[in-house]
């Protein structure tokens, strides 16, 4: 006697229904994830700017002045010359300069246009001004991005 085996598995129709349902779910989830990426990039910029500002404050505590605009943020990593700081810490104030979340260098002005010093990123567009992801984020407006 031959036994008949029952075949198990999914029909093509069942697989197609699952694919359609997954597509519908993805249409709701993906836009939310993209918005979170933009927010995460802005939060990283805020965190970096606060850390750079703290390192600059430590530099000023040791040397009585902030680095000049020409010396830039690089003065936090390697000892600047002309003018040479009086009490520069061995090893610097940070190990390396971070890039902003969009791969650009952070900007630094001393004296600043918005305060004693300005530390900022030009945002995703790399241009002054802008809105949304292209907005400039600086130590003068970080509260707007928290």
From Swiss-Prot:
Induction entry: By cyclic di-GMP and VpsR.
Reported effect, residue 100 to E: Complete loss of secretion
Transmembrane segments: 10-30
Subcellular localization, as worded in the UniProt entry: Cell inner membrane
Entry keyword annotation includes Transport: yes
Database matches in SUPFAM superfamilies: Pili subunits (SSF54523)
Any single Gene Ontology cellular-component annotation: type II protein secretion system complex
Top-level taxonomic group: Bacteria
Residues carrying N-methylphenylalanine: 10
Membrane topology: Single-pass membrane protein
Record keywords: Cell inner membrane, Cell membrane, Membrane, Methylation, Protein transport, Transmembrane, Transmembrane helix, Transport
General function of this protein: Core component of the type II secretion system required for the energy-dependent secretion of extracellular factors such as proteases and toxins from the periplasm. Pseudopilin (pilin-like) protein that polymerizes to form the pseudopilus. Further polymerization triggers pseudopilus growth.
UniProt-listed NCBIfam families: IV_pilin_GFxxxE, typeII_sec_gspG
Listed name of the protein: Type II secretion system core protein G
The species this protein was found in: Vibrio cholerae serotype O1 (strain ATCC 39315 / El Tor Inaba N16961)
Lineage, broadest ranks: Bacteria, Pseudomonadati, Pseudomonadota, Gammaproteobacteria, Vibrionales
């Amino acid at each position: 006697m031959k036994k008949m085996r029952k075949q198990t598995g999914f029909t093509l129709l069942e697989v197609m229904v699952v694919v359609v349902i997954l597509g519908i779910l993805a249409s709701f989830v993906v836009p939310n994830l993209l918005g979170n990426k933009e927010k995460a990039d802005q939060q990283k910029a805020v965190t970096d700017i606060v850390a750079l500002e703290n390192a600059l404050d430590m530099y000023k505590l040791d040397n009585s002045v902030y680095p000049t605009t020409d010396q830039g943020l690089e003065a936090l990593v390697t000892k600047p010359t002309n003018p040479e700081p009086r009490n520069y810490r061995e090893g610097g104030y940070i190990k390396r300069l971070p890039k902003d979340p969009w791969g650009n260098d952070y900007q630094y002005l001393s004296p600043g246009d918005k305060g004693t010093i300005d530390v900022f990123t030009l945002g995703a567009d790399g241009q002054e001004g802008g809105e949304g992801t292209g907005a400039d984020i600086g130590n003068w407006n970080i509260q707007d991005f928290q």
